[in-house]
UniProtKB/Swiss-Prot annotation:
Keywords: Cell membrane, Membrane, Metal-binding, Transport, Zinc. The gene is dabA. It comes from Staphylococcus aureus (strain NCTC 8325 / PS 47). Its main location: membrane. Forms a complex with DabB. The lineage of its organism: Bacteria, Bacillati, Bacillota, Bacilli, Bacillales. It is a peripheral membrane protein. Pfam families: DabA. This is Probable inorganic carbon transporter subunit DabA. Part of an energy-coupled inorganic carbon pump.
């Protein structure tokens, strides 16, 4: 029992190095380093470089591209270098320091000739011996690695590659539930037991190895303990050793981690995986592990050689000149080179890139308010002239009268604004919102796309239930979609007919004899379909939609808003009346919409349309767990239209005029159109006028928004008909980049719309409405930071990771991806499960980046004490800031910006 508890504890702690990976059909952005944020970004970068040879800093090419495009100001970088050098004193001639800095900051690689020079070997050996004598490890530290990493096989590759191939084979067999006709035998018992049963007959193992498998314990924890003991791994190194194995295939391990969270009977899935992996490693390594002890010394020697070569190359000090110094002087030089290594300068380049963006964002806001200052009351805009090198920009509107208490009755009637449209904070909504506001008396609002509703949706047109909220939050309620009994019966029959056709096709494809006949039967139709889809993608997609609407038309549906008793549901179905009032009130507060209601309020979810795209869910709403957010929007709108809810809101101080109507639309991000999801049958005259005005303006809005968006796609030249071109891109099954998604996301602004209204933020900013004056205790701000801002940070870091380390954190080229086991994609037929974004999602061409890999900048419009209170009360967010996983800036009522570093 003690052993079992110890191993389970080790695995529980080791899981920090991977992230749960949901199936690709419900792809949700994940921060690959969420479990590591107790350490600083810089420390994690060093650790990953040591244990997996993964560099998470932008490389030389990315830095040079950023400089060339004006995204990175070199003077900012140079100032950072100067400041860093002033903080330390080195007993080294200044000209050597200057030469070293001037050379290493270019991020040039040290030529191999320097590493191979005999004098470098002599110096490295000298320092290694001195290190042994002094028992000093001040310059370097190596984490425990799997044994198989240190052993090279006959093909010249690490033995861990053979271990990986075995684990890919077995994990694919276990996970597959959708594609294969014959699933893994005994998988219902557990992954480990199913493997034990089958591996005894696997002839990729020798007869002796199969005998070892036959004698393994039935308990996976005991197996893990046995292998670790066999390899003579110290108990204090158990976690590091297990972490190395989890990082070997983080995609497959992440998928198992996800499944262990979803089903009680699979809660020990990672334990099973590690037991199998460690046994496979033991079988393949054999007795060679005894020679691995020498690996640490050889790595130390190699580290000294690299550092000596770096000093000689960057300082322009020949190795024979270095040898003329005494050992203490040499140690000083090498200590400097170790301290001022290339990663230090990569980090400075990254910080300079982020500071440049921060400065440019300030300038945009400042310029935006200066351009309208003449048209606004002096109490609404106050642009300070006190900008200088020692003071932050002072640019903000001092709009303490923006609520306009003197005209509250006028505002309640909403006469100046015809419609208010609440969009998801998704960066793709920013340009669309800007064009809507420019088209007429329309106001836009930013809120997370799940609209604050912690629900699991059970939609009639979806096979499985879906958690329609941020993935870090468990659902608390289930909402069912239903229709009249007759309509539902007809729809179910149509669904079953369609399903049986697809099932028959799949059955024929996966069986030997029918698969020989299938090409003859389906060939002509599929060939014609291929030709039509290739030549006329937009028309073929429209035709398919018409056929679907005719033969599988979804009936008019309702939602289970009111609480229902359902003994089959593990969650409460629907809400009580008080819960409806509470959720409506919270959502309206999060939208900063508690007064001045327009006649027509639209809650706009968003969705993306693309064809033949395994990663389509990555273009959906991240706040809804990789699905469209129209369902949540419809639920909230229907609640807000209820008289009893409005009466309850009135008692809480929120009065919604009787003439105000809530409706629902969906922003299609791939075509920049607004599709109506729910419009009440009865509209007041002024609400109807607003509805018609918005509809009349939409064609022009879509054209402008599509033109702006399509201009950024690399494969498009001049666009004469942007709406048609956008629809073609969304329909073309050969298009690898139907839209840019959330690429180039860089900031998250929490504040009043007046702060950014009319300013072109280039589709790089998440915008969330917030008024600190209405949030006396900071609860709303904490909610925004803990939910929407966290989702935005996860999205940001997933794009970041997929750009800086695409081989490890990305998913490769879409053209060579293989959908596997119904859960994800691989490159070819035997790779890790690729859990990041594809190359086409972040790069414009082979050597041209599109996404700018910088950490998220969170901007809060509030006084300093409000931000300080947030950091004091929210330790999780404060840790992200202090450990450099994101950047934080605030702007107060006087318009002064402050960076919280």
């Amino acid at each position: 029992m003690t052993t079992q508890l110890n191993i389970n504890s080790v695995i529980e702690n080791a899981k920090r190095v991977i992230t749960p990976l949901s199936p690709i059909s419900i792809f949700a952005a994940r921060n690959p380093w969420e479990g590591l944020e107790a350490d600083t970004f810089e420390d994690v970068a060093k650790w990953l470089r040591d244990v997996r040879d993964v560099d998470i800093f932008p490389n030389k090419a990315l830095i040079e591209s950023a400089v060339a495009r004006g995204e990175l100001d070199e003077s900012v970088f140079n100032q950072l270098v100067t400041d860093m050098l002033l903080e330390h004193h080195y007993n080294i001639p200044q000209h050597y320091i200057n030469l070293y800095i001037d050379n290493i900051k270019t991020l040039k690689d040290v030529p191999a000739s320097y590493m191979n020079h005999s004098n470098v070997d002599v110096v490295a050996d000298l320092l290694l011996e001195k290190s042994k004598r002094d028992m000093a490890e001040s310059y370097h530290h190596y984490d425990v690695r799997p044994m198989s990493d240190a052993i090279i096989d006959e093909q010249g590759e690490p033995l861990s590659e053979q271990v990986n191939r075995q684990m890919i084979k077995w994990t694919k067999l276990y996970i597959d539930q959708f594609l294969s006709s014959w699933t893994m035998p005994k998988r219902e018992q557990s992954f480990y037991h199913a493997w034990l049963h089958l591996a005894q007959h696997d002839h990729s193992f020798t007869k002796a190895q199969r005998q070892v498998i036959k004698g393994l314990p039935n308990d996976p924890e005991m197996t893990i303990e046995s292998v670790l003991t066999h390899f003579s791994i110290d108990q204090e190194d158990y976690q590091a050793y297990v972490e190395g194995h989890l990082l070997a295939l983080p995609g497959w391990a992440g998928m198992l981690y996800y499944r262990s969270q979803q089903h009680h009977f699979e809660q020990h899935l990672l334990t099973d995986y590690l037991a199998i992996r460690l046994v496979v490693e033991q079988l393949l390594v054999g007795d060679e592990f005894k020679s691995v002890a020498k690996d640490c010394e050889s790595r130390s020697e190699n580290w000294f050689k690299q550092t000596v070569a770096s000093w000689c190359y960057y300082s322009d000090m020949p190795s024979d000149v270095l040898l003329q110094h005494d050992v203490n002087e040499i140690q000083t030089f090498i200590h400097f080179a170790a301290t001022m290594n290339k990663n230090v300068f990569k980090n400075l380049w990254l910080i300079a890139w982020e500071m440049t963006y921060e400065s440019q964002l300030k300038q945009k806001i400042k310029a935006g308010h200066e351009s309208v200052a003449g048209a606004l009351d002096v109490n609404q805009v106050n642009v300070s002239e006190n900008d200088n090198a020692n003071q932050p920009h002072s640019v903000l509107l001092n709009d303490t009268q923006a609520v306009d208490e003197n005209n509250s009755e006028l505002n309640q009637m909403g006469t100046s604004t015809k419609a208010q449209i609440a969009f998801c904070i998704d960066v793709r909504s920013e340009p669309f919102r800007r064009h809507i506001e420019a088209a007429g008396p329309f106001e836009t609002i930013g809120i997370a796309g799940f609209f604050g509703l912690p629900i699991q949706k059970d939609a009639v047109d979806e096979q499985f239930k879906h958690d329609s909220l941020p993935v870090m939050v468990p659902p608390a309620y289930r909402i069912k979609e239903f229709a009249d009994r007759y309509d539902m019966n007809v729809y179910r029959q149509q669904q079953q007919t369609m399903s049986s056709m697809f099932y028959t096709f799949k059955l024929m494809k996966n069986n030997v004899m029918p698969s020989l006949l299938l090409p003859e039967l389906s060939g002509p139709f599929l060939s014609l379909s291929t030709i039509v889809n290739s030549i006329m993608p937009r028309k073929s997609r429209a035709s398919l939609q018409k056929i679907k609407q005719k033969w599988l038309k979804k009936p008019e549906t309702k939602l289970t808003i009111d609480r229902e008793f359902d003994r089959t549901s593990d969650l409460p179905v629907g809400f009580t009346e008080q819960e409806q009032i509470d959720f409506a009130l919270q959502a309206l507060k999060l939208m900063d919409l508690t007064e001045a209601f327009a006649p027509f309020v639209v809650l706009a979810g968003h969705a993306s349309h693309s064809h033949n795209n395994p990663h389509h869910a990555s273009l959906e709403c991240g706040a809804c767990g990789g699905a469209s957010s129209g369902f949540n929007a419809k639920l909230l709108a229907m609640i807000c239209n209820r008289p009893n809810v409005r009466q309850g809101l009135k008692q809480s101080g929120v009065y919604i005029p009787e003439t105000t109507v809530f409706a629902v639309a969906e922003h299609h991000t791939s075509t920049d159109t607004l599709a109506w999801v729910y419009v009440p049958d009865t509209l007041s005259s002024i609400a109807l006028d607003a509805y018609e005005s918005l509809n009349d303006a939409m064609p022009m809005i879509s054209e402008h928004a599509n033109r702006e968006r399509l201009d950024k796609l690399p494969t498009i030249g001049r666009v004469n008909h942007p709406v048609e071109e956008a629809q073609r891109f969304a329909s073309d099954w050969s298009e690898v980049r139907p839209e840019w998604g959330l690429a180039k996301n860089a900031s998250f602004i929490i504040g009043r719309r007046q702060l950014t209204k009319g300013i072109d933020l280039e589709g790089r900013t998440f915008l969330h409405n917030y008024d600190w004056r209405k949030d006396k205790d900071g609860t709303l701000l904490n909610t925004i930071i803990s939910g929407p801002a966290l989702v935005a940070q996860w999205i940001n870091l997933q794009y970041y990771a997929s750009t800086v380390a695409p081989h490890f954190y990305g998913s490769g080229n879409k053209a060579t991806q293989t959908v596997t086991s119904g859960v994800g994609v691989m490159q070819g037929n035997a790779s890790d499960l690729m859990y990041g974004l594809s190359w086409q999602s972040v790069m414009a061409a082979d050597r041209t980046m599109y996404h700018s890999p910088i950490r998220l900048l969170v901007v809060i419009q509030a006084p300093d004490y409000v931000v300080a209170r947030l950091l004091a009360n929210n330790e999780h967010f404060a840790r992200k800031v202090s450990n450099h996983w994101l950047r934080l800036m605030s702007v107060n009522e006087e318009g002064r910006f402050k960076s919280w570093i």
